[in-house]
Amino acid sequence: MNIVEKTDAEILAIAEPLWRDLVKYSNEGKYGEFARNFSSSLARAMDQVAAGHQFANSELARSLSPAIDTLGIIRRGEHVTVLYRQRSTKKPGEWLGRLVLGYEDGKVRIFGATLF
């Protein structure tokens, strides 16, 4: 099944635990756990040294609030993008979280995850 064929509720049931894991492992600085659900292409593209440096030196990456607001879902091709309002426990303001999901080898994987 193509993930774009799933209902919003089905997509969110998959996406929210993945996003919460990203927040948790980012806060804890655990890169291996953070990247465990990445697609093979995203995992290859991530530089572990740069990611480790980001975890160690970014106050935002280490202070993400577990409270999120889902803003919407965008379907395109074989992927869905779930948008979140993300906050920090230490920095004022809000960030846009973007989680791109799709299937790889029959399993839902993360093809992109960013904060703007």
Model-derived features with residue positions:
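Short, low-complexity N-terminal intrinsically disordered segments enriched in polar/charged residues
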Residues: 1-28
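Charged/polar, solvent-exposed surface patches and flexible loops
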Residues: 17, 24, 36, 53-57
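Short, well-ordered alpha-helical segments enriched in acidic and aromatic residues
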Residues: 27-41
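Short, charge-rich amphipathic alpha-helical segments embedded
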Residues: 43-55
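Surface-exposed, charged secondary-structure patches
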Residues: 52-103, 112-116
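Short alpha-helical interface patches
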Residues: 8-12, 38-46
